[in-house]
Amino acid sequence: MKKNQFLKESDVTAESVFFMKRRQVLKALGISAAALSLPHAAHADLLSWFKGNDRPPAPAGKPLEFSKPAAWQNNLPLTPVDKVSGYNNFYEFGLDKADPAANAGSLKTDPWTLKISGEVAKPLTLDHDDLTRRFPLEERIYRMRCVEAWSMVVPWIGFPLHKLLALAEPTSNAKYVAFETIYAPEQMPGQQDRFIGGGLKYPYVEGLRLDEAMHPLTLMTVGVYGKALPPQNGAPVRLIVPWKYGFKGIKSIVSIKLTRERPPTTWNLAAPDEYGFYANVNPHVDHPRWSQATERFIGSGGILDVQRQPTLLFNGYADQVASLYRGLDLRENF
């Protein structure tokens, strides 16, 4: 495995830029004006989630046992843990980047059930302990690129998805893998009301081609920075596909289903002209409302240190994954 290229420590994201972009997305979905039409009582009920003192704090993640294979270690400057866990998109808990950390303590992650079904010879179910004990865990330092044109470098902990799928024995009919987030509106305010959750249809769903899911880079992730995932990062288990935009990294997964047909995906359903099924990081294919040619790295510096850097094709993993898309028009299949 080739070492990844360096990112500059001083590259930091200007949050105001992306807050404006998020508002543009919500406007396109028709959320802003509709939200203003809510009666006062409804506003009070919704905003009660965000008052602060009545929300349980997120539990501290437990230390995990894991290896550090040399192939997945590198000298990339890491994004500090407070930014990894404090600057998140998880609309089930609100739209601002700080909302998930503030509100996700309500999510109960133990007990937990993850079911693998569909076009498999041996359907199976994992419980909470299985997620950290059934497979050897390893730390992998990956780039993470958001579709909003900001990026991080994160030391995720998990196991390759292909090991889990191998246990289920996909049949010859399996062509795709569909993922689903837990549906728990009593714990997730964004699922309870469309104005908190950005107007998306829940539960959140995602999908990969089977060959993408079986690729060694694709990681079922249970930890970060040496500890179990905090709720705002997708506890107890989430998907990391480092060559794709971050919205493909579905969080708090309860179902993995192998299918014959391409499964629906949440952001593609919401805005198919803006968010494709593949969502491969590509500096040559812009979002309709902003460029993807460059990105801002969230590092250890402050706002005055902001610098842009070029976006790398497949987020810097082209040597490993470009062959998956040989002959595929990446502009048409974005």
UniProtKB/Swiss-Prot annotation:
InterPro entries cross-referenced by the UniProt entry: MsrP, OxRdtase_Mopterin-bd_dom, OxRdtase_Mopterin-bd_sf, TAT_signal
Binding site for Mo-molybdopterin: 88, 91-92, 146, 181, 233, 238, 249-251
Location(s), subcellular: Periplasm
Modification after translation (UniProt): Predicted to be exported by the Tat system. The position of the signal peptide cleavage has not been experimentally proven.
The keyword Metal-binding is assigned to this record: yes
Enzyme Commission number(s) of this protein: 1.8.5.-
Domain of life per record: Bacteria
GO cellular component, one term: periplasmic space
Main location class: periplasm
Single GO term (MF): metal ion binding
Cofactor(s) listed in the protein's UniProt record: Mo-molybdopterin
BP-aspect Gene Ontology terms: protein repair
Family matches, as Pfam families: Oxidored_molyb
Signal peptide annotation: 1-44
Co-factor note (free text): Binds 1 Mo-molybdopterin (Mo-MPT) cofactor per subunit.
Reactions this protein catalyses: L-methionyl-[protein] + a quinone + H2O = L-methionyl-(S)-S-oxide-[protein] + a quinol; L-methionyl-[protein] + a quinone + H2O = L-methionyl-(R)-S-oxide-[protein] + a quinol
UniProt entry keywords in alphabetical sequence: Metal-binding, Molybdenum, Oxidoreductase, Periplasm, Signal
PANTHER family, per database record: PROTEIN-METHIONINE-SULFOXIDE REDUCTASE (PTHR43032), PROTEIN-METHIONINE-SULFOXIDE REDUCTASE CATALYTIC SUBUNIT MSRP (PTHR43032:SF3)
Subunit structure: Heterodimer of a catalytic subunit (MsrP) and a heme-binding subunit (MsrQ).
Family named by the database record: Belongs to the MsrP family.
Protein's job: Part of the MsrPQ system that repairs oxidized periplasmic proteins containing methionine sulfoxide residues (Met-O), using respiratory chain electrons. Thus protects these proteins from oxidative-stress damage caused by reactive species of oxygen and chlorine generated by the host defense mechanisms. MsrPQ is essential for the maintenance of envelope integrity under bleach stress, rescuing a wide series of structurally unrelated periplasmic proteins from methionine oxidation, including the primary periplasmic chaperone SurA and the lipoprotein Pal.
Protein name, per record: Protein-methionine-sulfoxide reductase catalytic subunit MsrP
